[in-house]
Amino acid sequence: MNFIEAALLIQGSACVYSKKVEYLYSLVYQALDFISGKRRAKQLSLVQEDGSNRAVNSGTPCETEDEFLSLDDFPDSRANVDLKNDQASSELLIIPLLPMALVAPDEVEKSSNPLYSCQGEVLASRKDFRMNTCTPDPRGSFMLDPVGMCPVEPVDVHPMPRSQKDAEEAEEQPMAVSRNGSPVSVRSISQEPDGPALSSGDEDAEDVAELPEVALEPAEPRTSQQTAILPRRYMLRERQGAPEPASQPQETPDPWQSLDPFDSLDSKLFQKGKPYSVPPGVEEAPGQKRKRKGATKLQDFHQWYLDAYAEHPDGRRARRKGPSFADMEVLYWKHVKEQLETLQKLRRRKMTERWLPGAKQDLWPAEEERLEEPLEDLGVADDFLEAEEYVEESEGVMPREAAGLDAEAIPESLKYEELVRRNVELFIATSQKFIQETELSQRIRDWEDTIQPLLQEQEQHVPFDIHTYGDQLVSRFPQLNEWCPFAELVAGQPAFEVCRSMLASLQLANDYTVEITQQPGLEAAVDTMSLRLLTHQRAHMRFQTYAAPSMAQP
């Protein structure tokens, strides 16, 4: 890369960025000047206002300048109402439902009241042209009627007609007389949207005092109708009584709510329980001597089951396989399995004592403890499985050699070790059928069969010594400085010997003992390597006899 061009490029980019920084710097200063100028203009306007006020006070005329109205100089008006979500109606809550004016009528309602044209054609339904009815809100806005009734009107038990209600409100509305003699309606206290709904008697007195003075002057002679209406004009509308606070429903405690461990519970009165007398066999008298009780023997499940569930008058059950209750299935088969194992051990012991009379008696201590139990519980009088069935099953489980043992087949000099060895071999032979060979185990076995011969062959090879193989390769050269193909030097040798000779030749070339070259025609033949012997002296031998010049004696 040309460094001059690179330097010019860097200089140009630096100039561009410096101009950008200067432009941003000027923008910042312009913004600061604009802010300071606006502040100075505001100060000048304040000074001019002070000067104009002084001029007015002094009586000197000053020129009036046209000023624009600000956007927020409108007076507060009752027509503008800000609705807030947290302001709720004090009388009734508006149900947040879809207004009835926006609910589409059904097809049945449309067909029941159709709208016909002059020619008798059905144009539409009268239900399609429904007026949106609105209800004035206490805050001054108009709300759509959600359920067809005014949400701010109190719910009366006997609603009166609309016309009658309007008439009464017109009568209760106070009137006042203006300067020109025309009646003017005076707003009542209840019409104030922001004022409280209830007030005290002092406020009523103040409202009466605030009435115009014209109404307090002596009235002129009027007709009987006017005199009847006149006293009603000064009456204020009766205020409704304070509504009784609705009794809040008692909250029922949640039984699933977790209790507070640190909360103090209500104290409950102690209730005396019902006493029970202790049986004399259980009660311990203070003067009696306590005797150590032995361990109680558990009742035999088999005998208990027969006593509890036997349903025969003579006390014997029919031959049935398994209990009659599903709950006893597990216990039943567990008991049967234990009996079967005990009978098998008993039969095996009898056979051993028959052929080995001199065997030791303490070979099966656990079995002797089990055999101490009565034989009636082991299957002699068993109602579930008879003794003959145990014998048949045990004969099927015993090995075939042991089942067919006779006096002629087994010699008298048969020892216990020989019998155990035969049983173990028989067990191994019979357990082979339970071995399941998977696909992965088959692949592993094939790989082992393939790799085992190779490993054995590698173990038979002599250790690899690179100097020994180098000496053998040098000895095969006919003379110095003569090119010989590598294939001729290793002709007739196995593959692993060729690999070792190849590695030894590379070491010789590194020591400058031989020279390696390649003949043209690599694409035609793979073996194009040739070697030439340079010297018979080996490098490692030279290093052994090497002496540095500094070590030589002068």
Curated annotation (Swiss-Prot):
Region (Disordered): 154-296
Keyword Amino-acid biosynthesis listed: no
Record GO terms (molecular function): chromatin binding
Gene Ontology CC annotation, any one: condensin complex
Acidic residues: bias regions: 201-210
Superkingdom of source: Eukaryota
Lineage start: Eukaryota, Metazoa, Chordata, Craniata, Vertebrata
Gene name per UniProt: Ncaph2
Organism (species): Rattus norvegicus
Matches recorded under InterPro entries: CNDH2_C, H2_M, H2_N, Ncaph2
Alphabetic keyword roster: DNA condensation, Nucleus, Phosphoprotein
Cellular localization per UniProt: Nucleus
Family, as annotated: Belongs to the CND2 H2 (condensin-2 subunit 2) family.
Function text: Regulatory subunit of the condensin-2 complex, a complex that seems to provide chromosomes with an additional level of organization and rigidity and in establishing mitotic chromosome architecture. May promote the resolution of double-strand DNA catenanes (intertwines) between sister chromatids. Condensin-mediated compaction likely increases tension in catenated sister chromatids, providing directionality for type II topoisomerase-mediated strand exchanges toward chromatid decatenation. Required for decatenation of chromatin bridges at anaphase.
GO BP of this protein: female meiosis chromosome separation; female meiotic nuclear division; meiotic chromosome condensation; mitotic chromosome condensation; mitotic sister chromatid separation; positive regulation of chromosome segregation; positive regulation of chromosome separation; T cell differentiation in thymus
Residue numbers carrying Phosphoserine: S45, S178, S182, S199, S200, S441
UniProt subunit comment: Component of the condensin-2 complex, which contains the SMC2 and SMC4 heterodimer, and three non SMC subunits, NCAPG2, NCAPH2 and NCAPD3 that probably regulate the complex.
Protein's name in the database: Condensin-2 complex subunit H2
Polar residues compositional bias, start-end: 179-191
